[in-house]
């Protein structure tokens, strides 16, 4: 007896084959090319209908994962016979799982079984009564959409793909803006070259071109909305004595078109930056509190997803973005890099050169905790309290290393000694007596002698330290010299021994040759 398990969008169909050895005969499978032959060969033994669309999704996911669901197990247990029967399935993983159940089935899953399933699915509506092709197509489409949604696990609040695309677009916009601004300055510079030296902001430069047009209009237009009053006066003065060439209306139209592009791109870039900031606060608020929205977004984009970043250890997060330098260092056996993308975080930027590596390591450890909290804590709200607590710890660590409070711009240490303010003593007229003067002089002399003694003690200490250092250096030089002499002696001795061995060998060879001749 041979059964074929066919999974349909409507339910499980267990078909009984008229030929017991159909899976072994390639000719029989090849002959299943018409409806009559398929209907004659297979009959419906049992059909287990899915209860709902959600149930259908669960059953299909179980098949994909190679698991036997309760419905399928019940169907197979009800269908088992006294004699051992053959069960043909399409999925090898599912076949292994059915074998482990210990039912009275010999499970077969090979290339021939796939051809068999292909023939059955082609004429499935005719094999299953009450199921037409249109209904089957509708069920297949609905189930396919359900599987797609399940795999994507779509959530409007947890889509890190939006962050990845936004940060990539932001980088592209920056490059385009720089290119367009440079081209605009070079183009309009032929007409008004002095303007580029006075206006460094590209957007302000483009807005001036759109407002003013040719430089002769500078005295008539109002640029107070774009520039401060002082710079506006400088621009108008420079326009009157400019050394630039004249341009036509057609030239100006094209330059203005480029300037409009720059202004529009800048406005869109600002909007995109705000969008990215809001997305980061919704998806990874604690990571944003630690490293900022731009650096956090670059972390997620580089790792591929928020989950991948959360699974990464702190050491990986620390050097994320410096993979080329890392592998180059490993290849050449040099020092590995201390930081990657994390170098652009504000906390690392505040640290001095010698402390940057330490702060990068500390920040990476706390950022790893924050991103795991963002990713895996299901009960968390959108607050960034956990990230702010961690940031405070990193800031206190930075303050200890730098010796100053890094939360302020002041570079003066806050641990200064207290200043005692004492009242000035009133003048004592009795102190004018000669004895008092003498006593005062003697006190001054004593203080002077004490100062001299302190200075002499300092000199002695310095002298002793210097002598110790010189003795140590002499000792090291002597040891090096002795080692060198010993090495030279051993090398000479080894050379003499080698020469003696070679001479003895030569003598032996000569003797042996002489004895052979005799």
Swiss-Prot record:
Residues 283-403 form the Nop domain. Residues 462-484, 507-518 have a biased composition (Basic residues). Residues 440-451 have a biased composition (Acidic residues). GO terms for cellular component: box C/D methylation guide snoRNP complex; nucleolus; small-subunit processome. Its main location: nucleus. Signal peptide: none annotated. Residues 400-518 are annotated as: Disordered. It is found in: Nucleus, Nucleolus. GO terms for biological process: rRNA processing. SMART domains: NOSIC. Residues 452-461, 485-506 have a biased composition (Basic and acidic residues). Keywords: Nucleus, Ribonucleoprotein, Ribosome biogenesis, rRNA processing. Coiled coil: none annotated. GO terms for molecular function: snoRNA binding. It comes from the Eukaryota. InterPro entries: Nop56/Nop58 (IPR045056), NOP58/56_N (IPR012974), Nop_C (IPR042239), Nop_dom (IPR002687), Nop_dom_sf (IPR036070), NOSIC (IPR012976). Belongs to the NOP5/NOP56 family. Required for pre-18S rRNA processing. May bind microtubules. This is Nucleolar protein 58. It comes from Lodderomyces elongisporus (strain ATCC 11503 / CBS 2605 / JCM 1781 / NBRC 1676 / NRRL YB-4239) (Yeast).
């Amino acid at each position: 007896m041979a059964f074929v398990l066919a999974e349909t969008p409507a339910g499980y169909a267990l078909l009984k084959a008229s030929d017991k050895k159909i899976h072994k005969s390639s000719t029989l499978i090849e002959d299943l090319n018409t409806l009559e032959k398929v209907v004659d060969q297979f009959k419906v033994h049992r059909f287990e209908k899915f209860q709902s669309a959600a149930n259908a999704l669960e059953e299909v996911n179980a098949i994909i994962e190679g698991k036997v669901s309760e419905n399928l197990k019940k169907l197979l247990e009800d269908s088992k016979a006294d004699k051992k029967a053959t069960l043909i399935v399409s999925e090898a993983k599912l076949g292994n799982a059915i074998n482990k159940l210990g039912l009275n089935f010999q499970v077969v899953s090979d290339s021939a079984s796939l051809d068999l399933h292909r023939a059955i699915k082609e004429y499935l509506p005719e094999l299953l009564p009450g199921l037409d092709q249109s209904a089957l197509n509708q069920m297949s489409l609905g189930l396919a959409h359900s599987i797609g949604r399940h795999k994507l696990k779509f959530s409007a609040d947890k889509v890190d793909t939006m962050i990845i695309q936004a940060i990539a677009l932001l980088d592209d916009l920056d490059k385009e803006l720089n290119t367009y601004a440079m081209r605009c300055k070079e183009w309009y510079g032929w007409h008004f070259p002095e303007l580029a030296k006075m206006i460094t902001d590209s957007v302000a430069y483009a807005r001036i071109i759109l407002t003013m047009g040719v430089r002769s209009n500078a005295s008539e237009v109002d640029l107070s909305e774009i520039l401060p009053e002082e710079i506006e006066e400088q621009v108008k003065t420079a326009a009157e004595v400019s050394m630039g060439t004249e341009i036509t209306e057609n030239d100006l139209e094209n330059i203005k078109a480029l300037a409009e592009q720059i202004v529009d791109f800048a406005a869109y870039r600002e909007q995109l930056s705000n969008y990215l900031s809001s997305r980061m606060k919704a998806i990874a608020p604690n990571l944003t509190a630690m490293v900022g929205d731009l650096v956090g977004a670059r972390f997620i984009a580089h790792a591929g997803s928020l989950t991948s970043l959360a699974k990464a250890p702190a050491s990986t997060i620390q050097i994320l973005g410096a993979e080329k330098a890392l592998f180059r260092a490993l290849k050449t056996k040099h020092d590995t890099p201390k930081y990657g993308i994390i170098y652009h975080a504000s906390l690392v930027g505040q640290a001095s050169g010698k402390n940057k590596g330490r702060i990068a390591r500390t920040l990476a450890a706390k950022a790893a905790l924050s991103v795991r909290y963002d990713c895996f804590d299901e009960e968390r709200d959108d607050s960034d309290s956990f990230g702010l607590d961690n940031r405070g710890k990193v800031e206190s660590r930075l303050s200890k290393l730098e010796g100053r409070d890094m939360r302020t711009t002041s570079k003066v240490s806050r641990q200064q000694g207290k200043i005692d303010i004492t009242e000035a003593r009133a003048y004592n007229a009795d102190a004018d007596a000669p004895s008092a003067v003498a006593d005062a002089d003697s006190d001054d002399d004593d203080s002077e002698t004490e100062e001299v003694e302190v200075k002499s003690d300092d000199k002695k200490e310095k002298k002793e330290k210097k002598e110790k250092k010189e003795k140590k250096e002499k000792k090291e030089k002597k040891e090096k010299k002795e080692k060198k002499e010993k090495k030279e002696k051993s090398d000479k001795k080894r050379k003499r021994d080698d020469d003696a061995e070679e001479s003895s060998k030569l003598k032996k060879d000569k003797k042996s040759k002489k004895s052979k001749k005799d």
